[in-house]
């Protein structure tokens, strides 16, 4: 089994050290209460180096019992949404590029996955049209998410066609992964359309994702 590890650049104790303001997390107690840029990028670098060292599988300082290294690193998640990152676009770009450089220096064969774009609504497109040119040299795989909204509506290609067009508009030619795929009905038709529009890999989130809940029977 291959692991795609998501890196979060914030920890409660670290954010408290420079009196960052609390933020509202979508996951309650299961998530940090602070979502801002690290107080110290030097300390954050130390964390990243130790994290990669523990899971890179090089035989030195590895996690006890590690049988398969982590190669795929997803840096942050949906930064255009304040529920996951309380910072400016410039803060995100700084953290992302910094993280990518540190990881690649420590683990040259690492594959960096772009922080997943939450959707392709106008506000998402505006954010990523600005951010992508600033980070495009620091990731290997482009990443889009599709979670149905409270009304249960879905995009028939799971946003992949709009995302591919956005990437082309900013001269980004990278594989596309759909790492959070939630469908509104039988998933096969949606997956086929996503693949035909350029998705290389789809990770299905099943029936337990955020958004309008869907029964297992409804997916058949």
PLM segments and residue spans:
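Acidic/histidine-rich, metal-coordinating catalytic segments
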Residues: 115, 145, 176-182
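Aromatic/acidic polysaccharide-binding cleft in carbohydrate-active enzymes
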Residues: 178-220
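Beta-sheet entry/capping signal
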Residues: 2, 111, 140, 175-176, ...
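Structural recognition of alpha->loop->beta junctions
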Residues: 131-142, 193-203
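Substrate-binding cleft and catalytic face of glycoside hydrolase catalytic domains
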Residues: 1-139, 145-149
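Active-site-proximal cofactor/substrate-binding loop regions of enzyme domains
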Residues: 152-156
């Amino acid at each position: 089994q291959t692991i795609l590890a998501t890196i979060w650049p914030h920890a409660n104790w670290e954010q408290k050290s420079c009196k960052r303001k609390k933020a509202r997390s979508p996951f309650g107690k299961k998530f940090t209460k602070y979502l801002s840029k690290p107080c110290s990028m030097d300390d954050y670098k130390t964390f990243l180096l130790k994290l990669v060292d523990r899971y890179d599988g090089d035989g030195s300082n590895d996690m006890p019992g590690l049988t398969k290294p982590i190669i795929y690193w997803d840096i942050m998640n949906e930064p255009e949404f304040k529920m996951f990152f309380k910072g400016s676009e410039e803060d995100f770009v700084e953290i992302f590029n910094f993280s990518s450089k540190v990881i690649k220096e420590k683990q040259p064969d690492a594959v960096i996955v772009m922080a997943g774009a939450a959707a392709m609504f106008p506000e998402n497109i505006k954010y990523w049209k600005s951010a992508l040119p600033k980070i495009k040299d620091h990731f290997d795989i482009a990443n889009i998410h599709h979670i149905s909204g409270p009304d249960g509506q879905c995009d028939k290609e799971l946003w992949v066609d709009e995302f591919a067009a956005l990437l082309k508009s900013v001269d980004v030619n990278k594989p596309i992964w759909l790492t959070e795929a939630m469908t509104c009905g039988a998933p096969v038709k949606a997956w086929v359309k996503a693949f035909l529009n350029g998705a290389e890999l789809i990770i299905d989130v099943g029936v337990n994702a955020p958004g309008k809940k869907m029964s297992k029977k409804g997916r058949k």
